[in-house]
């Protein structure tokens, strides 16, 4: 937001509102009696709960008094009152808002859903002159002001609290109620008491959760009232870090902001774009040897183990000296010949160091016998082209994302071969990358040649500033203290865990984003960012630089480096396991599932030694020793205790363990590709299927009981390639937006010949889900493996639930 509008995002209110709607899918016919193909979602009930702002600092489930407008109830002076109002249409709610005397903050859990109805009901769109409206996307409204509802600032409580109503209710001991979702109710139908109770309960849970946040989390960022609560959990973490830094490191904090603002290339659009194009998220991939064969899935019984890194991103943030791209020490190389010589020299230098696990390499490169820099190169970004690149071991897990690359114009000549979206081989492959990504490629791939048409490198490196190192150490210390049964409150543990989970996300937030507005009852992109050749990029980037010039604490390229370095750590462990005679089966960001061939204890011992080296190298670093010392002195904490807990950071821990924590293989495991696997741990089935409900694990367990068969047999029958889970059991929904003209909707009638009382919004409907292997993966397996039978691809089955009975057809 621009400086002139810095206070646009603060509404000072006397009361706080909580709003929720209940909807049905109503079938309508037109004036000639023809029924519309699709139903229109209609509000049949909505609830508003109002409470005095100051009450939120003290209210809880035991001292709240809910007073409904339609009931006579005496005031209990020992409790905090909130007032509950019900409406049968949105029009009634909007009229109610006009009776509010002051600007009112109104929390809505998952605001985007209610917002889709509100913008259809109103006519004049957003008030973006006087207030700041915040969107994360066209389907993700975080905060809004509507011209036709001038007294209300809508906020999304889900963005701040990060949990569903059910999770929040369970957490505070005030559970969500149940209701029959299959009923289709109209705004004129008589409702049961449970309908009102259900609608109201969701708002009360949100109210109590916001109150809990205000009482237990907000004080850590110096906030005492709801007006100034952050909009998102990420903003809360940034504020918490800011308060910590200003309290314990005021001078360094201010100096860091000045340095980043005046010195960093982060305000250069070209640098931002190459760093963004080099970004690599978590590596999610699998081994093609473990995909389905002609007997079904390639199931593993009691033979695979699972390890993951303890706080992978936080480890990188603490352990790494980041290449620092300052205006003084950064050098652009635009000449293709020089850039190519440079990238070849760097690749050779990096490869020399890959066997030395923790080496912080710096590489001295000469061109035509002349040294190109006064110091070693500490890092680079480059756009490169690999010639005849291929996976070193065809049966390894590939690690180059195909979506982040391009091939020659003649795609047939490029002979790009992919598996689960990852590159296996290509005649010619172009991509943007940094030094950490190049190192990972050198571990996994061979290539005949490499060319470079652009590079920017730096001879400077820095660890994160001490205020941030100490903040991370402190949050990790709190988190591990709770896990190790130290004297730590669960609320403090949850706070610390939330902070650690958000710290990486803070670093990689896009600097330029689409501009979003509302037009004709629809959320649209008014200015698009990031598309190729888009003139808006420069305009939006300049706005970002101007608006953030006084508050620069994070460097985007650091976030890119954190992600690629964490990915590199995964690739290095994958390499280590292969050298110890293991097959890596599946990996996801910070974890590896592998099968051992040979001496299991020898593999476990090698992982222990690997971990010991990680710990030694971490605690040996001068900036870590100093950060621990500073943190312990400022926070009055025992230094040995901090070191002991910090010694687990970045180490590989076993996920496959028994009830007592002893290492054991999974009961069974199978994968159909990235984010598609089924495992059983200690008799409990778990499934991860991107886009599909976790309920599939329950479905497998229920089917085993129903058919009186083992969990393994049930899993093999249900978790199969080309299986369709229909709408009765998938848990999958699709969202479509009402687009019918308002004047046309005014002419419609329902089955009782009653008119519509609302113009619709997001229509959410249950749908089926097909569990299958990616098409490029099918083709590859077909061509490479004789055992991959064609019938395995063509035959399918459908799983459904009818009257409580699971059926497989």
Predicted regions and their residues:
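A short acidic-Thr-Gly-centered motif at the start of a beta-strand
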Residues: 1-15, 97-100, 147, 276-305, ...
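Two-metal-ion RNase H-like nuclease active-site motif
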Residues: 14-25, 305-307
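Conserved DEDDh/DEDDy metal-dependent 3′-5′ exonuclease domain
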Residues: 59-190, 198-201, 205
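Short active-site loop/helix that positions an aromatic residue
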Residues: 115-124, 211, 310-327, 598
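Cytochrome P450 catalytic domain signature, combining two hallmark sequence patches
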Residues: 124-136, 173-180, 214-221, 320-337, ...
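Short beta-strand
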Residues: 135, 583-588
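Acidic, Mg2+-coordinating catalytic module of metal-dependent nucleases/exonucleases
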Residues: 165-255, 570, 590
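C-terminal, non-catalytic extensions of nucleic-acid polymerases
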Residues: 214-296, 328, 373-374, 381, ...
């Amino acid at each position: 937001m621009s400086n002139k509008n810095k206070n646009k995002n603060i509404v000072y209110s006397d009361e706080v509102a909580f709003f929720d709607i209940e909807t049905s899918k109503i079938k309508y016919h037109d004036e000639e009696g023809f029924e519309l193909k699709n139903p229109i979602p209609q509000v049949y009930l909505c609830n508003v709960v109002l409470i005095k702002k100051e009450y939120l600092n003290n209210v809880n489930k035991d001292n709240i008094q809910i007073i409904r407008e339609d009931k006579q109830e005496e005031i209990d002076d020992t409790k905090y009152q909130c007032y509950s109002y019900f409406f049968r249409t949105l029009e009634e709610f909007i009229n109610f808002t006009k009776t509010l005397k002051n600007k009112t903050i109104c929390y809505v859990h998952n605001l985007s859903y209610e917002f889709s109805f509100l913008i259809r009901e109103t006519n004049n769109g957003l008030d973006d002159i006087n207030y700041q409206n915040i969107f994360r996307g066209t389907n993700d409204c975080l905060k809004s002001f509507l011209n036709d509802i001038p007294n209300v600032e809508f906020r999304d409580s889900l963005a701040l609290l990060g949990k569903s109503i059910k999770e929040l209710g369970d957490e505070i001991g005030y559970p969500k109620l149940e209701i029959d979702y299959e009923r289709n109710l109209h705004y004129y139908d008589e409702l049961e008491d449970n309908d009102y109770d259900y609608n109201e309960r969701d708002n009360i849970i949100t109210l109590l959760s916001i109150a809990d946040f205000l009482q237990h989390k907000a004080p850590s960022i110096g906030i005492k009232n709801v007006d100034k609560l952050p909009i998102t959990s990420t903003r809360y973490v940034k504020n918490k870090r800011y308060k910590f830094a200003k309290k314990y490191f005021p001078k360094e904090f201010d100096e860091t902001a000045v340095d980043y603002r005046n010195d960093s290339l982060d305000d250069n659009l070209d640098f931002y774009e190459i760093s963004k194009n080099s970004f690599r998220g978590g590596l999610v991939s699998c081994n093609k040897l473990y995909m389905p064969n002609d007997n079904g899935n390639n199931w593993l019984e009691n033979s695979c183990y699972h390890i993951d890194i303890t706080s992978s991103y936080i480890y990188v943030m603490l352990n790494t000296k980041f290449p620092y791209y300052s205006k003084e020490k950064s050098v652009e190389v635009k000449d293709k010949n020089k850039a190519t010589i440079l990238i070849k020299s760097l690749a050779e230098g990096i490869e020399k160091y890959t066997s030395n696990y923790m080496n912080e390499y710096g590489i001295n490169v000469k061109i035509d016998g002349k040294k190109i820099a006064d110091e070693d190169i500490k890092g680079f970004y480059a756009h490169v082209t690999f010639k005849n690149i291929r996976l070193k071991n065809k049966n390894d897990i590939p690690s180059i994302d195909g979506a982040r690359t391009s091939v020659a114009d003649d795609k047939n000549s490029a002979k790009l071969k992919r598996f689960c979206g990852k590159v296996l081989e290509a005649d010619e492959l172009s991509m943007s990358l940094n030094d950490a990504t190049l190192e990972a490629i050198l571990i996994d791939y061979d290539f005949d040649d490499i060319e470079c048409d652009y590079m920017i490198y730096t001879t400077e490196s820095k660890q994160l500033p001490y205020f941030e190192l100490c903040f991370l150490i402190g949050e990790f210390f709190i988190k591990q203290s709770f896990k190790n049964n130290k004297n730590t409150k669960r609320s403090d543990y949850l706070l610390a865990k939330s902070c650690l989970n958000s710290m990486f996300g803070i670093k990689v937030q896009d600097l330029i984003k689409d501009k979003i507005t509302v037009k004709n009852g629809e959320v649209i992109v008014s200015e698009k960012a990031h598309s190729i050749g888009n003139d808006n990029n420069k305009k939006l980037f300049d706005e970002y630089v101007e608006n953030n010039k006084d508050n620069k604490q994070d460097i985007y390229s650091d976030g890119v480096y954190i992600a690629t370095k964490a990915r590199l750590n995964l690739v290095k462990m994958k390499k280590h396991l292969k050298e110890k005679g293991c097959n890596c089966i599946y990996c996801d960001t910070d974890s590896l599932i592998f099968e051992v061939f040979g001496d299991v204890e020898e593999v476990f011992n090698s992982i222990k030694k690997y971990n010991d080296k990680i710990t030694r190298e971490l605690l040996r670093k001068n900036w870590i020793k100093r950060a621990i010392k500073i943190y312990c002195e400022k926070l009055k904490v025992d230094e040995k205790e901090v070191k002991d807990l910090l010694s687990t950071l970045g180490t590989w821990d076993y996920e496959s363990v028994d009830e007592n924590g002893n290492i054991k293989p999974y009961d069974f495991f199978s994968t159909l590709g990235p984010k598609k696997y089924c495992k059983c741990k200690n008799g409990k089935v778990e499934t991860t299927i991107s886009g599909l409900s976790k309920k599939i694990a329950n479905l497998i367990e229920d089917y085993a009981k129903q058919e009186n068969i083992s969990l393994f047999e049930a899993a093999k029958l249900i978790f199969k390639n080309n299986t369709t889970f229909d709408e009765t059991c998938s848990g999958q929904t699709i969202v479509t937006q009402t687009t019918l003209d308002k004047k046309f909707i005014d002419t419609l009638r329902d089955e009782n010949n009653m008119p519509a009382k609302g113009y619709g919004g997001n229509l959410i409907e249950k749908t089926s889900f097909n569990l299958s292997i990616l098409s490029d993966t099918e083709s590859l397996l077909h061509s490479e493996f004789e055992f991959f039978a064609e019938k395995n691809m063509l035959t399918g089955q459908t799983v459904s639930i009818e009257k409580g009975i699971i059926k497989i057809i």
